């Protein structure tokens, strides 16, 4: 009985010790697990905060950098445009301005509230051969977009640019020309402009240019380029100006696309110390343009160039003895004035008509 009692006490003690050990082990495990979780959470929070802080710092830095770049550009522009100074408009100058801010806002509001009446009045600012009675006809639909302005009126752009100024401004400067060289410059009066434009207009008519014909202008930056545009407008021909730096292929493409039968160019252009072979480029382009009837050539530098019989004519030959009077052609307000092509840097050049 004693032995049994001892064994029973021993077992109970063992069980108690085992339970105690297990309980201690569990408690330790729980504590360690909680500690680990707490450390993990703390680390996560710290990492998240750090990330957010880095992100914010980067954003702030990027924003500051952008602002700094913008401000630097602004300052550079201001310096370039005004030599480092900002010139405020004087009160005397503001008083003589054609329109002030209030006047502009008033006009704008009128144009929105009563659009047709507003443009009816604005249209009177230019001279009409036959005054308009209809202001606009606009259609917006999936099938058709059609926009017409002053479409029953007739006028001439060349007349509006030159002749209407002659009664009071004949001897005033119409064009200030600055050549490639600082010493090459001139001031052209309205009367001189009218005479030169009319002489060229008559010369163009003499070689067969008529109302509706397309004329390509491939010229250097000289007054004759302006005379050419205005002469075309005077006789109702549609002009297409092509930049004098374009290649023969680019020139040919534009001549063909606008169905031009006449070209006005020069022997050469000048850019700095470099001579631009305009006539040579034109000759190369015209090999692909069999429909071109005449090519008018301005003797600008006096360079030795080839002249093709029956097709090429000198600018001075068709203008020197021509009359300084040329009646402006009556044109409908919706008739085309000029064709201009985009550079074609993103594909085929687009047409502005």
Predicted regions and their residues:
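Periodic short-repeat tracts
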Residues: 8-12, 17-18, 23-28, 32-33, ...
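AMP-dependent adenylate-forming
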Residues: 161-188, 302-306
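Conserved pre-ATP/AMP-binding loop-to-beta segment of ANL
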Residues: 171-173, 295-297, 308-341, 348
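A short N-terminal helical cap/helix-turn-helix that marks the beginning
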Residues: 112-133, 152-176, 334
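Short, contiguous pre-domain boundary segments
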Residues: 82-106
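Conserved S/T- and glycine-rich ATP-binding loop of Class I adenylate-forming
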Residues: 215, 232, 336, 342-345
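Conserved AMP-binding/adenylate-forming core of the ANL superfamily
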Residues: 109, 158, 175-229, 247-252, ...
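Structural core segment of the AMP-binding/adenylate-forming
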Residues: 234-317
């Amino acid at each position: 009985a004693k032995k049994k009692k001892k064994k029973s006490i021993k077992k109970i003690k063992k069980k108690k010790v085992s339970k105690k050990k297990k309980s201690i082990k569990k408690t330790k495990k729980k504590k360690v697990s909680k500690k680990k979780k707490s450390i993990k959470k703390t680390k996560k929070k710290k990492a998240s905060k750090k990330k957010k802080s880095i992100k914010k710092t980067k954003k702030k830095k990027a924003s500051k950098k952008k602002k700094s770049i913008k401000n630097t550009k602004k300052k550079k522009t201001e310096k370039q445009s005004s030599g480092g100074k900002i010139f405020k408009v004087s009160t005397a100058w503001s008083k003589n301005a054609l329109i002030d801010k209030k006047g502009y806002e008033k006009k704008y509001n009128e144009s929105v509230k009563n659009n047709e009446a507003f443009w009816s009045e604005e249209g009177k600012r230019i001279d009409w051969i036959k005054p308009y009675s209809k202001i606009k006809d606009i259609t917006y639909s999936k099938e058709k977009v059609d926009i017409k302005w002053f479409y029953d009126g007739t006028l001439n752009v060349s007349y509006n640019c030159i002749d209407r100024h002659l009664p009071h401004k004949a001897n005033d400067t119409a064009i200030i020309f600055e050549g490639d060289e600082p010493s090459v410059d001139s001031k052209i009066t309205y009367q001189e402009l009218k005479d030169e434009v009319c002489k060229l207009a008559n010369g163009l008519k003499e070689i067969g240019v008529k109302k509706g014909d397309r004329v390509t202008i491939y010229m250097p930056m000289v007054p004759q380029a302006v005379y050419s545009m205005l002469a075309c407008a005077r006789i109702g021909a549609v002009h297409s100006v092509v930049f004098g730096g374009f290649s023969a292929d680019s020139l040919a493409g534009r001549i063909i696309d606008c169905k031009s039968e006449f070209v006005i160019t020069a022997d050469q252009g000048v850019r700095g110390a470099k001579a631009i072979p305009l006539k040579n480029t034109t000759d190369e382009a015209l090999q692909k343009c069999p429909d071109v009837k005449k090519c008018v050539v301005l003797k600008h530098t006096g360079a030795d160039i080839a002249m093709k019989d029956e097709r090429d004519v000198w600018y001075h030959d068709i203008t020197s003895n021509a009359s300084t009077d040329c009646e402006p052609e009556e044109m409908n307000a919706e008739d085309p004035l000029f064709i201009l092509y985009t550079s074609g840097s993103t594909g085929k050049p687009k047409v502005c008509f």
